[in-house]
């Protein structure tokens, strides 16, 4: 007799099943507008729940340390081939468990402890792993930063000046809260001027890059990382890409045996499924709509008197500043949550409030676009956001708007069950 239970989750663990069902209801009834979140397909989730969960596969395709890896080899190679086709690169490592681990592997491959790293200031829209002091990237390496100017945009001439003064070994370009297109060609010119590697972290805009709705980091960057969720709508994970064979070898060694052991084969299978979806012609339509919907947010919020960092957006998000308001990003986040709209509080350039309070919110369009919402829905939602912000302490209004938006959400349901 097998020791493995054949019960479904609902019958095997009612407590966990109940919690997951609650999350399904939250995702269905609320409007998800956190820029880094998205909805993945049932097929992707089905692959994540497959029997590959049981398989160890240390090493790389056809070079494993375990037996029985023929199917693990096949699915990982498929994911690699599809990733290279999407981004037009020669080499891809699909094993990183997260974007942060992908970034850690790049540093491990190309830097030594104490080497100089130049990345975007976290408070100006960068990411923890781009040299922020609390992060391993700021502790293991000598990190320096560039930021945005008074207009909320990068000044590439200024970044060149900083690079010449710092003389970094690697320059990181990419952001987690920057609403403008990043010019990778100009960054490569800066890197070449100081003899640095150019490392592009495209975690936030990868889905747009895949559809030619944002400049590609190739052929400009020496190495590129991304998450596989966010705008790529895949499983939670990371990926590293390059056109340089020697860098690819170093990256592979940095991932395994450097910072990871066995890859998550079930997640790699899900990445392969997501990559096939991205290769479908409909992906371009999705990415174009993501940008169009973000532009609606820009127009409405600006018309209603709200300040946007950089004045607007070129991608999937807007960053709203409350520096001139008597409420904080935390206040706005909580008020919008009461109204059934999920965003995240976010620091803004020259923020006077703590990172736990902030003076801004980040609003994204990818998740609601995935649900099928277009300009008309986004105009309605943007105005409701402004109504909440205009009446930040009116909880009765927030509850009323919540009910209205819940009715809207009923017309854009993705999932009919919580597990796949």
Swiss-Prot record:
Q: Which GO terms describe its molecular function?
A: glycine hydroxymethyltransferase activity; pyridoxal phosphate binding
Q: Which residues carry this modification: N6-(pyridoxal phosphate)lysine?
A: 230
Gene Ontology biological process terms from the UniProt entry? glycine biosynthetic process from serine; tetrahydrofolate interconversion
Per the UniProt record, the source organism is: Sulfurimonas denitrificans (strain ATCC 33889 / DSM 1251) (Thiomicrospira denitrificans (strain ATCC 33889 / DSM 1251))
Q: What does this protein do?
A: Catalyzes the reversible interconversion of serine and glycine with tetrahydrofolate (THF) serving as the one-carbon carrier. This reaction serves as the major source of one-carbon groups required for the biosynthesis of purines, thymidylate, methionine, and other important biomolecules. Also exhibits THF-independent aldolase activity toward beta-hydroxyamino acids, producing glycine and aldehydes, via a retro-aldol mechanism.
Question: Cofactor(s) for this protein?
Answer: pyridoxal 5'-phosphate
Provide the protein name. Serine hydroxymethyltransferase 2
Q: How does it assemble?
A: Homodimer.
The record's annotation in PROSITE patterns points to: SHMT
GO cellular-component term (any) = cytosol
Instruction: Name the InterPro entries for this protein.
Output: PyrdxlP-dep_Trfase, PyrdxlP-dep_Trfase_major, PyrdxlP-dep_Trfase_small, Ser_HO-MeTrfase, Ser_HO-MeTrfase-like, Ser_HO-MeTrfase_PLP_BS, SHMT-like_dom
**Pathway(s) annotated for this protein in UniProt:** One-carbon metabolism; tetrahydrofolate interconversion; Amino-acid biosynthesis; glycine biosynthesis; glycine from L-serine: step 1/1
Give the record's family classification.
Belongs to the SHMT family.
Check the record and name the Gene3D superfamilies matching this protein. Answer: Aspartate Aminotransferase, domain 1, Type I PLP-dependent aspartate aminotransferase-like (Major domain)
Top-level EC class, please?
Answer: transferase
Q: Where in the cell is it found?
A: Cytoplasm
Q: Does the keyword section mention Transferase?
A: yes
Name the gene behind this protein.
glyA2
